């Protein structure tokens, strides 16, 4: 039985809080990843590309989704990955199993990922590649994320505030470009991004032709930085999953829900009529923290038996 995408979080009242369960949306590229990939893949098809190429870290949700989709659709994929040659993570094992070609980059080389000339030099060894930026974070990825709003009644008009985690900001930009006019978007950065994220989101919105000002960022919840899980966050994850029976990933949705929980308890959401939290998927990341998620009532997989995910058509 396919479960509904919108689920109330019963612990929260005044205001009520719902969750959009994008982790239930697509088995190959769950969460926001399908939305970021779809328009990029459409352009790659039009260009006659023979290989989809991207980059990311050793636990990348984006690369995991891209490799799974490529394997299923028999389209070669490759990735420049920030990892040592000897490093093996559960995510990387999946990438290799699905046939993704991995090219290892040092941390210093990976820092050049925004340099067009450097990327062009990396792509020279590929046959008709189509390059997708880190996390699918380009205007096409954000444009795809605009379709998330279409999953909500009246494009989210029932909600005064929609809250989403931010890594690159592309999901927030897409949502901000498409939600109902009265709805505001709050982004929770999961990395220390005060110096650049707001600028990057504004640029993406300009690229989309939608320079809306209906969004803002709250940088208080980045914690120790990207992918870092503190003892306090670990305790919250276990408590939240036991109470709500909603699986969280350790990088994005854990910090997102921690932030919403903290703001609700402090009364910072008291002026809102209704709040929606975006579950952006990423549950494959649980496998990188077995000691933590083996303690969860949901286990490492975070999956409940007897349910199926809704499928996309790409």
Protein language model features and the residues they cover:
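PLP-dependent amino-acid enzyme catalytic core
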Residues: 1-304, 309-314
